[in-house]
Design a protein with these regions (language model features):
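C-terminal binding/interaction regions
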Residues: 1-22, 64-106
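Generic short beta-strand
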Residues: 28-29, 96
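Short, small/polar residue-rich loop motifs at catalytic or cofactor-binding pockets
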Residues: 23-27
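A short, polar/charged loop-to-alpha-helix boundary motif
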Residues: 46-60
Length: 106
């Protein structure tokens, strides 16, 4: 049986899946900062810049002045996503949830 996510974490899944759909990407992520603001992103793949969705979401939060994160959701990503290190650098105790494409926690 799949564990039910808290409402605020489920919202992050919805935001990440929406970013994934908009970008027609294979994965995406969303984070919530300590003020409750959310940031969602899909991977960026330019010749001059490569970011995973989680790296892009953390970068958006940090560039918006976030001083910490409460949670991060990675949809259809891998457990070795380099964005996990970015989450831990900004917020060592933040909850990190990895899900499949449908948003079911792994």
């Amino acid at each position: 049986m799949t564990e039910r996510l808290a409402d605020e974490d489920a919202k992050l899944v919805v935001l990440a899946r929406a970013a994934m759909a908009r970008a027609e990407a294979a994965s995406a992520a969303a984070v919530r900062d300590v003020d409750g603001r959310t940031y969602a992103a899909a991977p960026v793949s330019l010749s001059a810049l490569e970011l995973t969705g989680l790296q892009a979401a953390v970068a958006a939060a940090a560039s918006s002045g976030a001083t910490g994160l409460e949670a991060a959701v990675l949809v259809a990503g891998s457990q070795d996503d380099p964005g996990l290190a970015a989450v831990r650098e900004l917020a060592p105790l933040a909850a990190i949830i990895v899900t499949d494409r449908a948003g079911n926690p792994l």
